[in-house]
């Protein structure tokens, strides 16, 4: 898998987790909202680190 493909995959994953966080926020399940946001930030940071290489 090329670095560009991995970067796109990481961005898609972080986007999915952001959507999940919004869904849990609407259901007022704030613990899962925080967990999903943390995972999304983690994937986003990894994708950005891959960008800088």
Swiss-Prot record:
Membrane topology label: Multi-pass membrane protein
Induction: Transcription is highly induced by oxygen limitation and is under dual and independent control of Spo0A-AbrB and ResDE.
Localization per Swiss-Prot or TrEMBL: Cell membrane
Protein function: Involved in the production of the bacteriocin subtilosin. Required for maximal production and for optimal immunity to subtilosin.
The organism's place on the tree of life at top rank: Bacteria
Keyword Lyase: no
TM spans (from-to): 8-28, 30-50
Name of the protein this chain belongs to: Antilisterial bacteriocin subtilosin biosynthesis protein AlbB
Predominant location: membrane
Gene name, Swiss-Prot/TrEMBL: albB
UniProt KW keywords: Antibiotic biosynthesis, Bacteriocin biosynthesis, Bacteriocin immunity, Cell membrane, Membrane, Transmembrane, Transmembrane helix
GO terms, biological process: bacteriocin biosynthetic process; bacteriocin immunity
A cellular component annotation (GO) from this entry: plasma membrane
